[in-house]
Amino acid sequence: MKCLEVEHGLIRSVKLNEACSSGCGAFLLTVAKQLSLTLPLFVEASLASKEPCDLGTRCTVFMNSKVRQAQRDGASLEDIAAGLCRSIVRNALYKVLRIHDPAELGEHVVVQGGTFLNDAGLRALDEQIGRPI
């Protein structure tokens, strides 16, 4: 993950992730496969969630154990899928970018990459920052 802060058309700062946040889109695809879902079905499941699981904000390496625990606890695939999307977004915002308030992102937010190629990732970000991207 990378974050470029632009002010008056000039790059003000660049923040780069630690290794734990790279490949989040690929991680979602891997977990979808582990749950026997295609990525489109994973996204559909996430969007149908009634009560997303709280899987924390740890890096994706540790999230696998949280997913297995949620399965043992009887969480639905929908709630696990939505929980994963939310966890990845929260990890990116609060651990990688180290923001304290979503307002710190500024008025205009542009995203790219595998995590945001699906509506579930975008919805998780919208919900976390309190406005549509």
Residue ranges of each PLM-predicted region?
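Gly/Thr-rich phosphate-binding beta-strand-loop-beta motif of the actin/hexokinase/Hsp70
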Residues: 1-7, 51
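Generic beta-strand/beta-sheet core signal
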Residues: 6, 45, 112-114
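A glycine- and small-aliphatic-rich helix-loop capping segment at beta-alpha/alpha-beta transitions
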Residues: 6-13, 124-132
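Glycine-rich phosphate-binding loop plus the immediately following alpha-helix
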Residues: 12-51
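Active-site nucleophile and cofactor-binding loops and adjacent substrate-binding regions
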Residues: 15-23, 83-86, 110-116, 133
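Flexible, glycine/charged-enriched surface loops at secondary-structure junctions
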Residues: 39-45, 95-108
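Adenine-nucleotide phosphate-binding core of ATP-dependent small-molecule kinases
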Residues: 65-94
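Glycine-rich phosphate-binding loops at beta-strand->alpha-helix junctions
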Residues: 87, 100-128
